[in-house]
Amino acid sequence: MQVVGPISDEADDLNNTSIVLRLIYNGKSFLFTGDAEGVEEKEILAAGYDLQADVLKAGHHGSNASSTYVFLREVMPSFVVISVGAGNSYNLPGSDAMSRFRDTGATIYRTDESGSVLATVDAQGTL
């Protein structure tokens, strides 16, 4: 497991000090972005980390302020998991973010539609 963010502990919005973790297990990679938005994504990209991930936990519940095109191009996820409550008052996930996720070609799972999402990696490295 590698901590890739936050880069800076100074931000106008606490979402942009979220812990961002990259986990690699048996050849499969996962990126957990907390509530990170585009500001933090840009800092992480500038730091030069390898961000490729088979599974991306979408930043900030799929907010339009997160998961920018440039960030998603680096991550190249096969699966996107959006942790979001049904009927939330913030109208998340955002329609722009959903469009960006669809543009990656990734399979999208939403907890408001699917409930809990479980990803497993077996001994052969199959996700």
Give the predicted meaning of each segment.
Residues 43-116:
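Cap/insert and terminal regions of metallo-dependent hydrolase folds
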Residues 1-55, 113-127:
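Core dinuclear metal-dependent hydrolase active-site scaffold
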